[in-house]
């Protein structure tokens, strides 16, 4: 008996031609806006920075990042349509309110700024930003800053700094 080209092959006889798994994760929050998935866990590359640029409190070039809010709904009249962001993390050894770095590099801190360039101190809420129904973008920047005067030693090496953010709607 000849097999038709349209006959099916049982699962036991079929070759594995690829397989995988898709896992869906997330959380439900009590807020007027959802946070975009890209905003929840970000990496901002500050680049390879010359230690000379950091002497006497010098700064690297700011790198932009944002927190995306989507599907915002505030009702009518609008309530809780203003948001403040608080960044937290390990403070710099210089105790300057900036984010401390870990790794082999020393003598510098990460500064986080609002879109207008104003430094955001760790643990201090940003000024309120008014939101619209729909999608919104909260814009920030970060740069590496030397920790002190010309006597402060900046040591080259790799570094990392981690901050968490919290949103508070008003």
Residue ranges and their predicted role:
Residues 2-170:
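Mature extracellular/passenger domains of Gram-negative fimbrial/pilin and adhesin proteins
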């Amino acid at each position: 008996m000849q097999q038709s080209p349209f006959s099916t092959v049982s699962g036991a006889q079929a070759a594995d031609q690829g397989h995988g798994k898709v896992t869906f994760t997330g959380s439900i929050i009590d807020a007027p806006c959802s946070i975009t998935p890209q905003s929840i866990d970000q990496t901002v590359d500050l680049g390879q920075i010359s230690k000379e640029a950091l002497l006497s409190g010098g700064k690297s070039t700011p790198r932009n990042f944002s927190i995306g809010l989507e599907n915002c709904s505030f009702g009518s009249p609008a309530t809780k349509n203003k948001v403040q962001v608080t960044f937290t993390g390990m403070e710099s050894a210089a105790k300057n309110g900036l984010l401390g770095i870990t790794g082999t590099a020393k003598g510098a801190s990460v500064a986080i700024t609002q879109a207008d360039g104003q430094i955001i101190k760790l643990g201090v809420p940003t000024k309120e930003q008014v939101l619209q129904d729909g999608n919104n973008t909260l814009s920030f920047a970060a740069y590496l800053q030397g920790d002190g005067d010309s006597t402060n030693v900046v040591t080259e090496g790799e570094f990392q700094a981690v901050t968490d953010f919290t949103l508070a709607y008003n």
